[in-house]
């Protein structure tokens, strides 16, 4: 079976400030994130990864590069544009408080009712648009595993990964928040018997290896 390891990037300055950070916003990783990534590497040590794929956004690229360095393994790394975060439009860079004030309907739907989320007012990206760009790219990487036993690594973003992983599992759009969100520097593991969906969940949002228990705001 092919195993897919999905990692959310390390905690950033905007995460710490409570700002929305999508496909058009980026901020540096916090110093503490590098300790968390090292702990993640220790957790994953012993797994031989055939390939790693990463979002083009810098916070994800730095996470992936640091993780591979800490693993001390020559893992090929490919930038995959399909793994970028949601385009959050006008919400990019805004604080959680300001978004709740100016775009309450959009925020509620984005967080709690994905089927009702209409991002046209904020010039953002819908759940179907995100899923339709990401799923084919990920499935294609599984199809390239001729051995059928490879370990693959994907480094991406919280909101995007939560939606995409649930879609890979066959979860209806209305239920994609049923397992909650994903924490900075967490890993979620799926298993695939070839590229046909749905895949199988082995571990959701694993964080037991982190040096300190995550805060509620570290999960999205």
Tell me what each language-model feature is.
Residues 1-49, 65, 69-73, 101, ...:
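An N-terminal RHG(E/S)-centered segment typical of histidine phosphatases
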Residues 3-7, 78, 150-156:
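Beta-strand elements within well-structured catalytic alpha/beta cores of enzymes
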Residues 34, 57, 100, 127-135:
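Amphipathic, non-transmembrane alpha-helical scaffold segments
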Residues 39-108:
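Phosphate-coordination/substrate-recognition cap region in phosphate-metabolizing enzymes
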Residues 54-55, 132, 155-156:
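Short beta-strand scaffold positions
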Residues 108-129:
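Short glycine/proline- and acidic residue-enriched helix-loop micro-motifs
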Residues 158-162:
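GST superfamily/GST-like fold recognition
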């Amino acid at each position: 079976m092919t195993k897919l390891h999905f990692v959310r990037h390390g905690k950033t300055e905007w995460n710490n400030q409570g700002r929305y950070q999508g496909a058009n916003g980026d901020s540096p990783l916090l110093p503490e994130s590098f300790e968390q990534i090292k702990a993640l590497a220790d957790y994953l040590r012993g797994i031989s990864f055939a390939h790693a794929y990463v979002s083009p956004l810098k916070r994800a690229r730095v996470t992936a590069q640091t993780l591979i360095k800490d693993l001390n393994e020559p893992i090929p790394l490919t930038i995959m544009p399909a793994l970028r975060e949601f385009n959050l439009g006008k919400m990019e860079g805004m604080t959680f408080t300001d978004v709740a004030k100016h775009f309450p309907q959009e925020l509620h739907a984005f967080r709690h009712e994905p089927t009702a989320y209409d991002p046209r007012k904020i010039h953002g990206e819908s759940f179907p648009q995100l899923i339709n760009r990401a799923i084919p790219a990920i499935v294609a990487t599984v199809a390239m595993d001729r051995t059928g036993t490879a370990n693959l690594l994907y480094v991406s973003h919280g909101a995007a990964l939560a939606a995409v992983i649930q879609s890979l599992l066959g979860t209806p759009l209305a239920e994609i928040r049923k397992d909650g969100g994903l924490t900075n520097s967490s890993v979620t593991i799926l298993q695939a018997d070839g590229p046909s969906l749905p895949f199988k969940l082995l571990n959701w949002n694993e964080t037991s290896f982190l040096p300190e228990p995550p805060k509620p705001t570290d999960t999205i």
